[in-house]
């Protein structure tokens, strides 16, 4: 029995060593494997995707997805454990934190764009969103076309800001687009009347902390398509492959359905056909 146990132990140790020796020397997987720790950048204010729970722990849809991915990476590297070290970031610092090496990946509500690919790489898509606008119910604003002469707040440097500017030009809506630093400033402008609307991803708008949510409503317009992904360091194909392998497993085995239901059943959101296709495309074969 002892001989069998020793043989099995030697086999698994050899398999783990083999998995780690195949990692390119310049990949962050080397550091991750050596430290048995992976650093994940996450925002505290992007509910329901990435935010702080009651005990100040990192929670959300994207956080749960990344926890499952980390479990897969642990298995791929043959590690007995792989701890997560959370790195707090803002909407402005999330990509530079990954690019500079302060974090190995970023999990939240980050939209993939060609411009952002100049700074970071991205995983397979993990969600699809759209840009929306929240306005006061007391206003006469019933659609985006009614925003002429109004002020629309959007976080500076986001795809929402770009989308609103493009839609204003496309539909000849002569509104003032006001840049804010974060969601808190956008909400403050909306509640004080300094802005007539606040633009962001629709589910982020649903998760806003408004003093009196009943006073506000979301316009029906869907003003852009926002494909979310995990941000990764540029050029690190081994880490990107490990992450995409984890995502493929989650999608193939159906674990993503449970994560989706956990976060979106409570607000009555059903999985759209487009999102089902997105998961299907990410369920790559080994």
Predicted regions and their residues:
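Periplasmic-binding protein-like
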Residues: 44, 126-138, 184, 202, ...
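Acidic, polar ligand-binding/catalytic clefts
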Residues: 67, 71, 78-146, 216-217, ...
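Extracytoplasmic small-molecule ligand-binding "clamshell" domains
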Residues: 21-106
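A ligand-binding cleft/hinge motif common to bilobed small-molecule-binding domains
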Residues: 92-93, 107-119, 163-170, 188-224
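Extended ligand-binding regions for polar small-molecule ligands
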Residues: 20-23, 29, 60-72, 138-140, ...
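Bacterial N-terminal signal peptides
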Residues: 3-15
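Bilobed "Venus flytrap"/periplasmic-binding protein-like clamshell domains
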Residues: 39-48, 58-75, 111, 129-183, ...
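Ligand-binding clefts/hinges and TM-proximal coupling segments of bilobed small-molecule sensing domains
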Residues: 20-23, 159-178, 213, 217-218, ...
């Amino acid at each position: 029995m002892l001989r069998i146990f020793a043989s099995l132990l030697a086999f698994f140790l050899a398999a783990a060593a083999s998995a780690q020796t195949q990692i390119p020397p310049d990949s962050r997987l080397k550091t991750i494997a050596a430290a048995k720790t992976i650093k994940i950048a996450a925002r505290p204010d992007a509910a329901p995707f990435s935010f702080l729970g009651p005990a100040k722990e990192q929670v959300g849809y994207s956080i749960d997805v990344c926890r499952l991915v980390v479990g897969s990476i642990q298995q791929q590297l043959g590690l007995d454990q792989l701890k997560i070290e959370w790195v707090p970031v803002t909407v402005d610092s999330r990509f530079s934190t990954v690019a500079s090496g302060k974090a190995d990946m970023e999990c939240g509500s980050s939209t993939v764009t060609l411009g952002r690919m100049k700074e970071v790489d991205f995983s397979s898509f993990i969600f699809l969103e759209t840009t929306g606008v929240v306005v006061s119910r007391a206003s006469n604003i019933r659609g985006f076309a009614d925003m002429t002469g109004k002020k629309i707040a959007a976080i500076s440097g986001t795809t929402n800001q770009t989308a609103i500017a493009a839609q204003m030009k496309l539909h000849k809506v002569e509104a003032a687009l006001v840049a804010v630093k974060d969601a808190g400033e956008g909400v403050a402008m909306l509640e004080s009347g300094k802005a007539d609307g606040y633009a962001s991803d629709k589910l982020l708008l649903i998760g806003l902390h408004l003093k009196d949510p009943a006073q506000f409503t979301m316009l029906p317009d869907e003003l852009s398509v926002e494909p979310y992904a995990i941000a990764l360091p540029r050029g690190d194909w081994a880490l990107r492959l490990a992450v995409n392998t984890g995502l493929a497993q989650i999608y193939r085995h159906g674990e993503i359905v449970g994560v989706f239901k956990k976060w979106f059943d409570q607000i009555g959101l059903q999985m759209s056909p487009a999102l089902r296709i997105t998961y299907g495309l990410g369920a790559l074969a080994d």
